[in-house]
Amino acid sequence: MFASVGVHGPELSPTAALILDVLLLGAATLLLLQDKRMTRHQGVLLLSFVAVVAVLRVVMASLPNVQPVTVAVLLAGASLGARRGVAFAILVTMLSNSVLGDGYWTLFQAAGWSLIAAVGSRANLMEGDRLLLGRATMFAAVLALPFGLVTNMSLIGGGVGLAQLPALVWTGLPFDLSHALGNVVVMLWTGPLMLRMLLPVDVPDATAIPGVEADVQLV
């Protein structure tokens, strides 16, 4: 997965990079706005977790191909559904890349993590509110490989032709396997905690609590 070690595809002009960022941000915003079931509290929770995971990715950037984002987007898809999971994946990619480096590769990283979020929404990784840790760990490991394939596509056009892709994938396999191993460690270590951070806590309407409505009206 060369995109994580500084090898990237075509360089974008500032205007093209801005257009790409606007399109990605617009896609994430549209996905969230279309989700009529999402409450304001859930929206704040989602954006807060975006910030937490983005910071984690930046802090762990020195560890080759250890990607806490992969586990986070998989669990976001499993607990929040495909729409919110994909929006989460896009926003985390954009926010963390604003520090690590933004460019053409951002599109492919966002696409790879969005794919993982979509798979997570269909993978039956939860039983009620409980994480099926063994199943989730298996998916986290296996999905490192298609993520590596998607991100390697960002190299096409940057001096690399489509015919060279198989050799590129083979050469990058050790990076993808280290990503898979990292996903196993991150899932076993932090998976249940991440899920608790993602699951919304029922916050009752203040006016529905006996005695609160009168107090609110007096203020």
Describe each region flagged by the PLM:
Residues 1-21, 106-110, 118, 122-219:
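Membrane-embedded alpha-helical hairpins and interfacial helices in multi-pass inner-membrane proteins
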Residues 2-75:
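Hydrophobic transmembrane alpha-helices
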Residues 23-24, 43-48, 88, 92, ...:
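Short hydrophobic/aromatic-rich motifs at helix boundaries and adjacent loops
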Residues 38-46, 81-85, 194:
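Membrane-interfacial loop-to-transmembrane alpha-helix junctions, especially the N-terminal start
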Residues 42, 62, 66, 81-82, ...:
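Hydrophobic alpha-helical segments, principally membrane-spanning helices and signal/leader peptides
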Residues 45, 69, 77, 85, ...:
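Generic hydrophobic alpha-helical membrane-segment signal
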Residues 49-121:
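Alpha-helical membrane segments and adjacent membrane-interface helices in multi-pass membrane proteins
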